[in-house]
Amino acid sequence: QFIMIRKMQLADTHLSLILMQAFTAFGVFLMRQSYLSIPNELSEAARIDGLSEFGIYSRIMLPLSKSAIATLIIFSFVNVWNDYMGPMIYLNSTELKTIQLGLRMFITQYSADYNLIMAAALISLIPVGALFLSMQRFFIEGVATSGLKG
């Protein structure tokens, strides 16, 4: 992966971290299961009504899979946010280092400033909590509409 990132000239960029976590097997299987749970009758009815395949995807499949997309966004963000080895390998510039590498800078060979580590860890939870709270309504919609039939 590192050689591929270097050949695309994305080494030492945040985009390299995002691309390495954007298309994971978890995301593929989560979205597959989400699309398989949507009844075929909906897409067949849309085809009969004259809707194109893109229209079926954009007007039926995508809105019904909002909860799965929100889940995928949250899990991907948390995975990238908590990644330690990826930034350690792909980022060389000090100003591009992530907060996880910054937490490691509080630990020296002989001591660790635990009060600063805990304060920084608490601050690093704020974006994850904000993302979860902003995506929470999609979970509620998914649970509310999952029991509806036809």
Locations of the language-model features?
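A structural signal for multi-pass alpha-helical bundles of membrane permease subunits
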Residues: 1-150
